[in-house]
Amino acid sequence: MMEKKFIDSLQEIEEIEKSTPVEEFIPFKSTYEAIYDSAMSHSDKTAISFFLSGDDYKNSIEVTYKDLISNITRTANFFHSLGLREDDTVAFVLPNLPETHYVLWGAEAACRVFAVNSLLDAEKIRELVNATEAKAVVTMAPIIGSDLWEKVSSIATELYHTRFLIGVDITHYVPSFPETMKAEINEKIRVNMELLENIEYFDLVHEIREIDGEQLKFDRTYQEDTVSSMFCTGGTTGLPKIAQRTHRNEIFDASAVKTFSQEVFNSEAVILAGVPLFHVTGALATGLVSFMSGGSLVMTTPSGYRGQNVFSQIWNIVEHYRVTAMIGVPTVYAHLLNIPLTGQDISSLEYCMCGSAPFPTALYREFANYIDAEVIEAYGLTEGTCISSGTPPGIKEKIGSIGLR
């Protein structure tokens, strides 16, 4: 285990701020460079463990750091091959998949990315995609149990700037998936696409398999104000508002979180990742911060914590992967109080991070007493990249008051 390096006073934080030039928190020009650097140091280490349902937690798909950066590179090169450049936008309407990370960080490398809440109805998706003038939209290929293809393909003729519709076929995660059903999926895609003019369809999994993953096939200059991503803000009524962020924003935020929470995010960490990747917490906390730290993510199904039998198997998952930290929202932790421990060894779980909504004091105390792990509250907003303030690990009596200032 790594030595604890608690930052436990405002004075210590102020000393770090005074003595550390801001550029030390921004050691890379792009998020691609940041992930690439970590991948070179942890190439054979597991970056992602992914399973399709809670009951399949012992049969995970393992993605090493070498695989991760290779697939991100392939995806970036694929987008570039479509003619997408730095001012163009790739929108994704996807659940939590390894491919979602490839699209997210690959698009940031080649152009810019727009994360769309996959739970929104088709009309809202249409308005948001048109607002960003996305030239490519990535979504799920048709498959039983998901309505994403139906939603996105139904509005394709009304996506006025979109030239490419890209499907993610996850049947490769199911070796026993019937060939007849794959044929039905391909036929459904063919029929849908014949109805569309001026839009080309690509199968992402197939396309990137054929592309070089050793290095980017293009040169790009990243300025301080180069936009990396667009995410929708939370907590608003009506259509979500779209916030632009830069590579500089994302690298600084990830570096700062990594520095001030070294006990949580480090190369020995195993993070339970159930927050959606269309949310900044999912993308940064269970994405960029973990990757830059060389830690491992356990992706709990395409639907995250909402996935089939994830909650009923949660303590088995923690025990099996020796999870060291999990990230969730108050409703997740409230639900976990109803999941009994039945002899599982969850002693590896040291930290439970909570954000997105206030953590009720009574729930905080009840959960902290239920399991022997430290609850860490964080506050942030999409416009501020992700985490803006957090109570450092080791500070146990700051319930309801986030940070030390």
Specify the residue positions occupied by each region the protein language model found.
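Conserved AMP-binding/adenylate-forming core of the ANL superfamily
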Residues: 44, 48-97, 101-104, 121-126, ...
